[in-house]
Amino acid sequence: MPGMGHGPYMFRWEGEEIYTLIEKAHCTAYTEFGIPGVSPRSVLETFIPREELFPPKPGTSWEWHHAFGAWEADFGTWLCPNLLNDYWGEARSLDELIARSELLQSEGYKTIYEEARRQKPYCSMALNWCFNEPWPTAANNSIVAY
């Protein structure tokens, strides 16, 4: 359906920030977008052994709970360490990693929803894809955060 926001997919790794991508978009609906975030510490501690909590690494419980390798297009999904490191450098603690991830996620969603509202009445829908995992994950979790 022309004008619908599902595809073509747009990614920051293609060289443009969401702030400019969404402002230039002109869709009737944005039906699949997301900014994954790290799950709260209290959730992580229920399934990641203490010795694996920080730093997150592939091949550990982080990977088995979708922080790495959750999507074939980018092995860093859904933790997105390269994205977080581009903005802030390496996190020095789990709490710092979580705080940075939460900030990036909240600012990204704020930008998308505010711009979708500015595009009213042409744009009538904005539905994110994140927050719908059916089980406890390390990143890109359910809104209920188990």
Enumerate the language-model features and the residues they cover:
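Aromatic- and carboxylate-enriched substrate-binding clefts and catalytic-loop regions
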Residues: M1-W13
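Substrate-binding clefts and catalytic carboxylate motifs of secreted carbohydrate-active enzymes
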Residues: E14-Y146
